[in-house]
UniProtKB/Swiss-Prot annotation:
An annotated GO BP: neuropeptide signaling pathway
Residue ranges annotated as Cytoplasmic topological domain: 49-68, 131-151, 238-268, 326-403
Gene3D superfamilies named among the record's database cross-references: Rhodopsin 7-helix transmembrane proteins
Subcellular location field: Membrane
Record protein name field: Neuromedin U receptor homolog nmur-2
SMART domains (UniProt xref): 7TM_GPCR_Srsx
Topology of this chain in the membrane: Multi-pass membrane protein
Keywords: G-protein coupled receptor, Membrane, Receptor, Transducer, Transmembrane, Transmembrane helix
Similarity section: Belongs to the G-protein coupled receptor 1 family.
Keyword Repeat on entry: no
Stretches of the chain found on the membrane's Extracellular side: 1-27, 90-109, 173-216, 290-304
Domain of life: Eukaryota
Organism: Caenorhabditis elegans
Length: 403
């Protein structure tokens, strides 16, 4: 009998396991696209974020607060990709249950993914605040926006994220599917269970299924504190920045050319950072929707879930997975698309001056400077700036929060 086949000596138990946990193995129609998409995300994300760290570290002209935040964000993305995607690959190719690994691995993976997701949003809040301060309160910015303060905020962000993610390590465990009440005292019970409590071969890594209230509390806390509140704060800050830049265009005093250049530089940087923020929230919204769906469709008076809700949960599962990991690969692409100065530093650092100039030589229009040619120190000084966990088994009818 294939390992993918769910079959017990008692047909009622077979139906119960299938209706609750779903099939053990995913179909080829799901596995192949999933592996291709995740493989592409993994390679692009890992390469792009490692290059981002190298570019920022290797160019002293990029050692400024905003780039320190972007470096930290790249580190968070690298951790998420390395810890998350290999397990996604494995679970796509292997059977979904029983869980093969130890409870320590189960807890560690869940904690680290939650930890890095919290760190990402806190870093995004930090560089949004830094830009808001620099444009709307420039005098205060000169005191606040220093490398030392940026390092302190980054350490603080990671520390807070670590502490807030700790509950995950305590509530996540290897669960087993409990026997139905009417099956606990049957003559055939010992054929499907060794302890008379749980069904054989149904282990899965997830939050403790006997503590639904705590599961809800953690997911709602993460959604509120690390998604809704940051989103509101960031919208307010960028709205204030937009108003400030618009008013500065109208009321240009002193050296108009200097102020125009400064505003243009600010707008370029803001365009890139705002793209990072928007991408983050677009990619993470399905993730949080899926987590909320998982707890509010699972923990009701009955475990029966209507077919439309099952279908919606499955669709949101796939969308949330692809979006969640796509966000980790998107930032380096945005930097290259939206920042010519980053492209220049990227090409010079990764490819070298001679190779970069040769590669891009044929792509220059008359009078246009080479995109990867060496920039002056003054140009580089302004480079790029002036101055949580899904349910693992999509096909289950009972959507539990898995890792």
């Amino acid at each position: 009998m294939s390992q993918c086949t769910v079959e017990y000596n008692v047909s009622e138990i077979t139906e119960y396991v299938l209706s609750t946990l779903g099939e053990r193995c995913q179909s080829a129609g799901i596995v192949i696209p999933t592996v291709i998409i995740y493989g592409t995300i993994f390679l692009l994300g890992l390469f792009g974020n490692i290059c981002t760290c190298i570019v920022i570290a290797a160019n002293k002209s990029m050692h400024n607060p905003t780039n320190y935040y972007l470096f930290s964000l790249a580190v968070s993305d690298i951790i998420a990709l390395i810890l998350g995607l290999p397990m996604e690959f494995y679970q796509s190719l292997d059977y979904s249950y029983p869980y093969r690994f130890s409870e320590g691995i189960c807890k560690a993976r869940a904690f680290l993914i939650e930890f890095t997701s919290y760190a990402s949003i806190m870093i995004i809040c930090c560089f949004s605040f830094e830009r808001w301060l620099a444009i709307c309160h420039p005098l205060r910015s000169k005191i606040f926006s220093t490398l030392w303060r940026a390092n302190v905020l980054i350490i603080l962000a990671w520390t807070i994220s670590f502490v807030c993610a700790l509950p995950i390590a305590f509530i996540v465990q290897i669960n087993k599917l409990p026997l139905p009440e009417d099956a606990k005292y049957q003559p055939w019970t010992n054929k499907v269970s060794t302890d008379g409590i749980f069904v054989l071969h149904t282990e899965f890594c997830a939050m403790n299924q006997s503590r639904p209230d705590q599961q809800k509390m953690i997911i709602i806390f993460a959604f509120t504190v690390f998604f809704v509140i940051p989103a509101i704060a960031i919208v307010i800050m960028y709205a204030h920045i937009a108003v400030q830049l618009e008013s500065s265009e109208i009321d240009l005093k002193g050296d108009k050319m200097v102020k125009k250049r400064r505003n243009k530089s600010n707008r370029t940087v803001l365009k890139m950072l705002l793209s990072v923020v928007i991408t983050f929230f677009i990619c993470w919204l399905p993730f949080h929707i899926q987590r909320l769906l998982s707890v509010y469709t699972t923990w009701s008076e009955t475990t029966t879930i209507s077919p439309p809700v099952q279908f919606l949960s499955m669709i949101v599962f796939y969308i949330s997975g692809f979006c969640y990991y796509s966000n980790s690969a998107a930032n380096p692409i945005l930097y290259n698309i939206l920042s010519q100065k980053y492209r220049s530093a990227f090409c010079r650092t990764i490819l070298g001056d001679h190779i970069a100039n040769f590669v891009f030589k044929g792509h220059q229009r008359p009078g246009q400077s080479k995109r990867c040619s060496s920039s002056t120190e003054a140009e580089q000084r302004t480079l790029m700036t002036r101055g949580s966990v899904r349910v693992d088994k999509p096909h289950r009818k009972l959507e539990v929060h898995n890792y």
